[in-house]
Design a protein with these regions (language model features):
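Residue-level preference for the first positions of well-ordered beta-strands
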Residues: 1-5, 85-87, 228
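Hydrophobic/aromatic beta-strand patches that form the interior of the parallel beta-sheet core
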Residues: 4, 30, 87, 104-106, ...
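Glycine-rich phosphate-binding P-loop
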Residues: 4-21
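A short beta-strand-loop structural module common to alpha/beta enzyme folds
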Residues: 27-37
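ATP-dependent small-molecule kinase phosphotransfer cores
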Residues: 35-88, 125
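RNA pseudouridine synthases
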Residues: 80-110, 114, 118-120
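N-terminal targeting leaders
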Residues: 99, 110-113, 117-121, 138, ...
Length: 271
């Protein structure tokens, strides 16, 4: 079957749309709350942020810690996507599955006043409180996407079709998405499945590598090259280079891995 990735503004009713599609297709439904919990648990198991004497909490979302956690979150998202028959309702998943033939990325929006009204009814709060909370959620989501992907909330490259729950009924949106997903299902081939599995593998390697304190995680570049993976970046020395290559190859297993890691210590000696 297919993969559905839903990007939405806060308070649009995307949650209800996702659940209705889950009930129809029998897909596994995975929201941001579950993904964050799984990413945090995976981070703990891999000793993220406490490796090599680092004592930062995984709840401190700043600098390298944020990027390391995002790498872990991306890995969790792609592991679920690689299983297929899944609905992902989380920020950024559209970017991660873009270009996968059997993946459908959609965007759900609504006017601010409509979203405020929905939030008031759902949470039982007054208009001003609802307005402040909805706008705060918009800012936080937009900021997170800019940091993680260099893109904003409404980037048209991140979705195939856009819906407005302020003007379109939920049933209408659900019916359109049903038809699109059934069309996407026909595009699932062994090659398409291999592509999403390779992306999941790349994300898993990246999540493991960036926890290494000797690695400048902001320099990390990984890409699929044919049947293999290319890893580029800057490390602080030969010891870290060997350690990172060892960890990456352990995860890649039989998949060919090319490591192109530049040592800072070597460059300093040359200069």
């Amino acid at each position: 079957m297919a993969i559905l990735s839903i990007s939405s503004e806060f308070g649009t009713g995307a949650l209800e749309i996702g659940r209705e599609l889950r009930n129809y297709f029998g897909y596994e439904y995975i929201g941001i709350g579950r993904l964050l919990r799984e990413a945090k648990e995976a981070a703990k198991q891999m000793n993220l942020f406490v490796a090599k004497g680092r004592q930062e909490s995984i709840d401190s979302w700043g600098g390298n810690e944020f990027m390391s956690f995002m790498a872990m979150l991306h890995s969790v998202i792609l592991e679920h996507a690689a299983k297929d028959n899944v609905i992902l309702l989380t920020r950024g998943s559209n970017y991660l599955v873009k270009g996968i033939p059997h993946a459908l990325g959609i965007r759900i929006v609504a006017p601010l006043d409509y979203r405020i009204e929905r939030f008031m009814k759902k949470e039982g709060v007054n208009r001003e409180t609802a307005r402040l909370l909805v706008k705060q959620a918009d800012r936080e989501i937009d900021c997170a996407l800019h940091i993680a992907y260099g893109k904003g909330l409404d980037d048209p490259e991140a979705y195939e079709i856009k819906f407005d729950t302020g003007t379109q009924k939920q049933e209408e949106i659900v019916e359109i998405v049903k038809n699109l997903l059934e069309s996407k299902d026909a595009l699932k081939t062994p090659e398409a499945q291999k592509l999403i599995q390779m992306r999941a593998l790349v994300a898993r390697i990246k999540a493991k590598v960036v926890i290494n304190p000797g690695f400048y995680s902001t320099t990390l570049e990984m890409e699929i090259k044919g049947d293999g993976i290319l890893l580029r970046g800057v490390v602080s020395g030969k010891a870290e280079q060997k350690e990172i290559e060892k960890e990456a190859r352990e995860i890649a297993r039989s998949v060919p891995l090319i490591c192109d890691l530049d040592c800072q210590s070597t460059r300093k000696k040359k200069s």
